[in-house]
């Protein structure tokens, strides 16, 4: 399993979500613009005069994003570990938020993180110009999942990896409910086929509340979904619904 690439707008508390989305939109805009500057600088070297300004602005916003993510990931991993323990009590799920290597403490104040980002990007200016791309920043953040202290992507079975992913999904959903008082719509695409019956039953019981859409390819599993509407799709055509 590849590391879980971090989405820019986590399901963090509502006010923080609004601020995070605003920051993420601005960061993405700056990132796209700076990428164009680097890409086109070979034909128009004068564009590089803007490199410093965009790098400083990205560092300022990126520091705030990193700090948001660090706090949210800590909360998410704690909740996900509890979910995973209910599914597989003999294994321990943990994780590491991976951001720019120069950031020594993602929980530090934003000014400290910003300075570390600035130092990092300026030390890589020549490399960025040669690569024609932005080489570091929160756009490359990851969440590495660990099982019993070892990388799930490298050492976990398919079932373990799928259970890790489900644990994160269910934890995000529960954190959202704790904050907003309602569950978000949950979409699960063929996630049950690689789980044994005990884990299938656990997942289905865990998602009994709220709106959920599940796809599956096995009739045996679909029988367990009779609490909701079930319909079949074959050759792009949807059959009559059953309950």
Residue map of PLM features:
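Conserved NTPase motor "head" modules and their coupling/switch loops across ABC/AAA+ ATPases, GTPases
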Residues: 46-185, 194-198, 202-205, 219-226, ...
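Secondary-structure edge/capping motif, primarily at the C-terminal ends of alpha-helices
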Residues: 38-45
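Walker B catalytic acidic pair
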Residues: 189-191
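DNA-recognition element of transcription regulators
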Residues: 161, 210-211
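Extended, charged alpha-helical "arm/stalk" segments used for dimerization and assembly
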Residues: 1-38
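Conserved beta-strand scaffold positions in the cores of enzyme catalytic domains, especially
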Residues: 212, 230-232
